[in-house]
């Protein structure tokens, strides 16, 4: 089971290559032999989703099973499945982010890799900081969170 936590500031070169931080690389090597899937996030937050291959193989059939006559479901399928790129970390722990995904998330040199338990999100540093600075006052809290104590 994945237990990805924490935020990591990383850099991407002009060719779209980025080095996965050592701690993350070691987790991915142990969990999935460094085989990952990188895809677009389907909501308004312009970031990418990075799944270890075993987690992706659990999620993918659920997305494929959505009713494709439903416009929202079809959009989700197109964004997530249509942008999915299976890749493997190279010997230096790097991946090459496809140009289409870089464009989707407005990725340039400075990035943030954010752990969310079973997956990572890959953000431009600028978008991540803007997200953190934004007010959550307009967001509706789900009932499940109202009883949560931190």
From Swiss-Prot:
SpoVT-AbrB domain segment(s): 7-55, 84-127
InterPro entries named in the record: MraZ, MraZ_C, MraZ_dom, MraZ_N, MraZ_sf, SpoVT-AbrB_dom, SpoVT-AbrB_sf
Main location: cytoplasm
GO CC, one annotated term: cytoplasm
GO biological process: negative regulation of DNA-templated transcription initiation
MF terms (GO), sorted A to Z: DNA-binding transcription factor activity; transcription cis-regulatory region binding
Domain of life: Bacteria
Subcellular location(s) per record: Cytoplasm, Nucleoid
CDD domains (UniProt xref): MraZ_C, MraZ_N
UniProt keyword terms in alphabetical order: Cytoplasm, DNA-binding, Repeat, Transcription, Transcription regulation
Pfam families, alphabetized: MraZ
Known partners and oligomeric status: Forms oligomers.
Family per record: Belongs to the MraZ family.
Protein name, as recorded: Transcriptional regulator MraZ
